[in-house]
Amino acid sequence: MIRPLCSKIIISYIFAISQFLLAANAWSPTDSYVPGTVSCPDDINLVREATSISQNESAWLEKRNKVTSVALKDFLTRATANFSDSSEVLSKLFNDGNSENLPKIAVAVSGGGYRSMLTGAGVLAAMDNRTEGAYEHGLGGLLQSTTYLSGASGGNWLVGTLALNNWTSVQDILNNMQNDDSIWDLSDSIVTPGGINIFKTAKRWDHISNAVESKQNADYNTSLADIWGRALAYNFFPSLNRGGIGLTWSSIRDFPVFQNAEMPFPISVADGRYPGTKVINLNATVFEFNPFEMGSWDPSLNSFANVKYLGTNVSNGVPLERGKCTAGFDNAGFIMGTSSTLFNQFLLRINSTHLPSFITRLARHFLKDLSQDFNDIAVYSPNPFKDTKFLDSDYTTSIVDSDSLFLVDGGEDDENVPVLPLIQKERDVDIIFAVDNSADMRLAWPDGSSLVHTYERQFVKQGQGMSFPYVPDTNTFVNLGLNKKPTFFGCDANNLTDLQYIPPLVVYLPNAEYSFNSNQSAFKLSYSESQRRSMIQNGFEIATRNNFTDDPEFMGCVGCAIIRRKQQALNITLPPECETCFKNYCWNGTLDTTPLPDVEKDVHHSFINVNSFNSSIGQEESLYAGSSASQSSSSSSSSSSSSEIPSATATLEKKAATNSGSHLSGISVKFSAMIMLTLLMFTGAV
């Protein structure tokens, strides 16, 4: 239902000017990638205990509730228009003047590189009133009714792009796709942005290298994540100077569209890694970045810091130099690029026998140093949580004792759909739309692993105090086809009373093929305009059950899911149509644990042991994101070379690093960029 419109030069020009003026008020104090010193109150404390949401978030929610109340009433009225009687439930939710009766909606978009960014964009477009056709033929208005929007890795590229471009719409991105400096111009890889113009590519990488080197020369630790984030940003903020070189994540709080609560509350998710280790599991500390704070609800930290002043040298939240703070460290590209999963997955490919031997030798030597020096992760130094006292006494103080904080992609703990910030009891979310674009299986489709791991986390030490509804094992997900269509989990709160608290109902929206083979490789770093539009269109169809052709009543069922928690809490009679919906979409506890055949088995992307190259040679497999659907010849030919997905079968690396330093030398900044470029070119990722 998404239709491309003719490019409009005047609109594009006005948009570019507005972005420039907006960014001018949100720039780093140094007007560059380098953080700078700013004044702050002498008595300021930048860290708080995670006992509740922040005062800033609470004040923002009061505004947002007024906005979502109007939008949600309109959406539910349309969704239940064909119901026999929905007046009682709607009257109770909206006419009592009690905001606590208002269902609180959240959307979480998984990681998965550009595959997830584009497919997730289609899902959000289907929920957005601003999308052509979404109000009449989609779930238009649902996004306007949403309070929280979280993303991990590729999902965060989507969330960050929309939020930091003044809450632009996917429709607007589509309308301007043929213009110069258009958002998400993926025609050429971020590695070779000039295409055949090698001078443009060289200039881009020179700018990136200079930016990272300038940060390093200012005595800040840098890593490949800095280079990666800078490279990515040019596709997210093309109208801004050098891809928003000074644009900060905290600038979202200064945008009028956010201040007026006219957009959801954006959240980026990352995983912490204990100094001296390389293992990520369910006990990893999960961090979130929102417009006001970054930190973790987990008992291993239990703290939040003011995201605007990251980079400030503190002890227990107090700046070591009173009255002076650091700003600009929270560079938008850096936070959106706080990811190493894509690096780790692509780096495994260097064992491929088709690479020149000198490249293989060089890469192995380089990657060994990377792993030991932590250059494969994002380094937040100085540590904003240095010497904090809020963590649970049962946990090691490794995080708060360290001078640096080390973060990796939020999906490296196998919880690729970033729901953890949304299931916190303090946020009181009623329903989560979980958009899963993971490549869990051989053909790069999801198998529910992320939800399974989140469910399991509540029973390990780190998950104490959290709740998540019951979900089946991954074999059941696949055998019952739950990974190919929308499924509701946790439909009946009466069956969840043995959990810590009643968790949100989860509407699972897995990536599936409707009009396009959207199971593209995470290593596919370029998409033609036609492919981008097709990926987004397919995402629209995922959210709408193929434009409601698979189920004309699906919008009504979404409405039933939204009101379910409040309906049960308030003891309101459900419309009979909702009972039919729940029978059709709620998982009823049925299991089918029959093992999957080898051709379908899972390919879980665990942390890679880059020091064991010899033992892992031969383990890599070339896997194909194949499709039975016929595509146009141009689409097929342009994507076939990028459809290989590597197998991540290496064991978890538990050996401690011998060197905890994380500072790239002056010469290695440019060398790192060159290595990244060379490896990606030879591995076919470009």
From Swiss-Prot:
GO terms for cellular component: cytosol; endoplasmic reticulum; extracellular region; fungal-type vacuole; plasma membrane; side of membrane. It is an enzyme of class 3 (hydrolase). Residues 39-592 form the PLA2c domain. It comes from the Eukaryota. Its EC number is 3.1.1.5. One of its GO terms (biological process) is phosphatidylserine catabolic process. A lipid is attached at residue 659 (GPI-anchor amidated asparagine). CDD domains: cPLA2_Fungal_PLB. Residues 660-686 form a propeptide. Residues 1-26 form the signal peptide. PROSITE patterns: PLA2C. SMART domains: PLAc (SM00022). It is found in: Cell membrane. It is a lipid-anchor; GPI-anchor. Glycans are attached at residues 56, 82, 129, 166, 221, 283, 313, 351, 495, 519, 547, 571, 588, 614. It catalyses: a 1-acyl-sn-glycero-3-phosphocholine + H2O = sn-glycerol 3-phosphocholine + a fatty acid + H(+). GO terms for molecular function: lysophospholipase activity; phospholipase A2 activity. SUPFAM superfamilies: FabD/lysophospholipase-like. Keywords: Cell membrane, Glycoprotein, GPI-anchor, Hydrolase, Lipid degradation, Lipid metabolism, Lipoprotein, Membrane, Signal. Belongs to the lysophospholipase family. Sequentially removes both fatty acyl groups from diacylglycerophospholipids and therefore has both phospholipase A and lysophospholipase activities. Substrate preference is phosphatidylserine > phosphatidylinositol. Does not cleave phosphatidylcholine, phosphatidylethanolamine, phosphatidic acid and phosphatidylinositol-bisphosphate. Mainly responsible for the degradation of phosphatidylinositol in vivo. This is Lysophospholipase 3. It comes from Saccharomyces cerevisiae (strain ATCC 204508 / S288c). The lineage of its organism: Eukaryota, Fungi, Dikarya, Ascomycota, Saccharomycotina.
